[in-house]
Amino acid sequence: MCKAGFAGDDAPCTVFPSIVGRPRHTGVMVGMCQKGSYVGDEAQSKRGILTLKYPIEHGIVTNWDDMEKIWHHTFYNELRVAPEEHPVLLTEAPLNPKANREKMTQIMFETFNTPAMYVAIQAVLSLYASGRTTGIVMDSGDGVSHTVPIYEGYALPHAILRLDLAGRDLTDYLMKILTERGYSFTTTAEREIVRDIKEKLAYVALDFEAEMQTATSSALEKSYELPDGQVITIGNERFRCPEALFQPSFLGMESAGIHETTYNSIMKCDVDIRKDLYGNVVLSGGTTMFPGIADRMNKELTALAPSTMKIKIIAPPERKYSVWIGSILASLSTFQQMWISKEEYDESGPSIVHRKCF
C-alpha cells in the first residue's frame, strides 16, 4: 500500500495499492481510451485485462520505472500537487540498500524537480508517532516484517532483523486452510476476499493449544458473507492464521517468530539500553492489527526476558498508519534544517542522502 498526504494531517489523504498494471493485449478495449499503464485502485479494478506488477518487494523497491509511475500518480492524480512546489518526505525500509536511497533522491530531484526532500526509516517514524525516541519497533506490513531497535532517535543497524513473513503470507495461509474446509479460493480476486476475511475475523490466541481445545465446540465459529451472497463458516482458522507470526513453521519456514525476533534484536544491543527497549516495544503496521496480538507478545517476551525485566508492549489504535503519522516530523520547525535542498543535491549529487538522512 502507498500512503500519501500532507505533513501534520491526522491521517493520509490517500491510500492505494502499490501496483502498476499494463494491458495484456493491446487494442482489446476498443472505444475506451487505452492507457499504457494503470496505477493503484484503477489497476486493481481492471486486473482482468492487465498484467499486474508490484515494484516493491519485501519493502524494497526493485522496479524503478514502475515506482516512478506510482509517484507520478501520487503527485498528479491523488494529491493533485505540483511536486516542484513542495518538499517531499519519503520513507524507506530498514536496511534499504545505499544505492536505493540514492536512486530515490535522484528521481525526486531530477524527474520531479522537488525543492527539497528527506528519506526517513519507517520504523523510526512509527516510534516518533508513539511519542518516543527510544524503543524497539516491531513493524509488520504486507511484504516484510522488521524489528528495529532505536536509541535517542537513531536506528541501530547492527541489531535490525528482517523477517520475510507478513500480511501477504498470512492471506496465502488462510487461503490454504480454508481450502481444507472445502472452500476454494484461487484467483487474485478471491485472494482479496480472503484478505478481507482475515482483516475482519482473525485474532491471536493467548494460548494456542488451549484455544484449539475450545474451538472443538462451535463457540468460536463466525460466518462471513461472500460477495455472491453465499455464507461461509470459519472456526479455528480465525486464530490459526495469525499464529504463523509466532510459529513460522506453520508456513514451512524455519525462521524465528516475531516474539523471538524481537528478543534477538534486543540481545544484539548494548546491555545498558536493553531495559529501555523491553519497556518500549512498539507495534506498527497493518499486520499487527490482529486483536490479542499485544497480550500474546507480552506473554512470549516475558517468557524469554530476564525474570525481573519490566516489559511493556505499546499498540496504538492507529498503528496501521503510524509510519505515516510519524511524518508529522516534517512539519516541525526543528526539522526544516534537515531537508536536503535542491542546491545541496546539485552540488554533491545523490550521495548527499547518506550524510543528511540516517
UniProtKB/Swiss-Prot annotation:
UniProt keyword list: ATP-binding, Cytoplasm, Cytoskeleton, Hydrolase, Nucleotide-binding
Cross-referenced SMART domains: ACTIN
Gene3D superfamilies from the UniProt entry: 3.30.420.40, Actin, Chain A, domain 4
GO biological process: phagocytosis
Cleavable signal peptide: none
One MF annotation (Gene Ontology) recorded for this entry: ATP binding
Primary subcellular site in the record, as a coarse category: cytoplasm
Keyword ATP-binding among record annotations: yes
Entry-linked InterPro entries: Actin, Actin/actin-like_CS, Actin_CS, ATPase_NBD
Top-level EC class: hydrolase
Reactions it catalyzes: ATP + H2O = ADP + phosphate + H(+)
This enzyme's EC code(s): 3.6.4.-
Gene Ontology cellular component annotations, sorted alphabetically: actin cytoskeleton; phagocytic vesicle
Superkingdom of the source species: Eukaryota
Subcellular locations according to the entry: Cytoplasm, Cytoskeleton
PROSITE patterns membership: ACTINS_1, ACTINS_2, ACTINS_ACT_LIKE
Function of the protein: Actins are highly conserved proteins that are involved in various types of cell motility and are ubiquitously expressed in all eukaryotic cells. Multiple isoforms are involved in various cellular functions such as cytoskeleton structure, cell mobility, chromosome movement and muscle contraction.
Name of the molecule in the record: Putative actin-23
Native organism taxonomy: Eukaryota, Amoebozoa, Evosea, Eumycetozoa, Dictyostelia
